[in-house]
Amino acid sequence: MKFIEVKNLKIEFTKIDESGREVPGKTALDGISLDIEKGSFVAVVGMNGSGKSTLAKCFNGLLAPSAGRVIVGGFDTAEEAHIWDVRCRVGMVFQNPYNQIVSSIVEDDVAFGPENLGIEPKEIRRRVDDALKRVGMYELRDKGAHMLSGGQKQRIAIAGAIAMRPECIVFDEPTAMLDPKGRASVMSIIRDLNAEGITCILITHFMSEAEQADRVIVLKNGKVLCDRTPEELFSDKEMIERAGLEMPPAIEIRDKAGLPEHLTTADDIADYIAKQ
């Protein structure tokens, strides 16, 4: 079942010329068409400037199309009357965890979104407790947000998105500023959320994260270069080179060891070796 439909999407930014007039500037997305299935886990990758984060902002209406359409759960993101419907269905978690905290106390920060929906206090309490437990931060619910590490702050940002009860969460490079331990924690949470039926869209430049998705969309110069399963993509070295990407470490180990191509993650490889 289609949850997000992107039809010939174009995003153009304008600039001011020397005479002070607004003129066409960069075309960030150029004719993007794709569908996101409900309950899927999709990774979007590409070099810097490929259009990844711009596309992410289109999924919940932060950016309106210059041309084309983005339909979310049946609602057109270009129609202002439907923006609230879109944003209730699609939550977002951004790259910088330090810029996403709006309250001084952990549980107050997670409650911020539901409070703005006008939800009853008892229901907010249930949602906040549930969200914090799901990201492993319940024990720190009454702590000062300023005392948290970057990884902990990112988990709080994810809890805030969960508390809104969206059908989909877009993660825009959520691990870019985290250490390996923080990255692993966030990826574990994303996999768990997807296992519960939440549609997850991961924007990332880490191929080791993309390989954990059901599907990988590769962008280059604002266009879709390819749309494949991780197994298909990481078995095509020529495509990886065209996209300006690097093979995940697990794939490099697999190839050097002469292991079967269907093994795409470190866990796959470990399980295969253990059974030999």
Q: How should each PLM-predicted stretch be described?
A:
Residues 60:
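Helix-to-loop junction immediately C-terminal to a conserved catalytic motif
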Residues 240-276:
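ABC ATPase nucleotide-binding domains
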Residues 68-78, 86:
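Conserved ABC transporter NBD signature motif
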Residues 122-140:
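Conserved ABC ATPase "signature" region
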Residues 144-148, 152:
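Conserved ABC ATPase signature
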Residues 45-47:
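The feature captures the beta-strand-to-loop junction immediately N-terminal to the Walker
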Residues 169-172:
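Catalytic Walker B motif of ABC-type/P-loop ATPase nucleotide-binding domains
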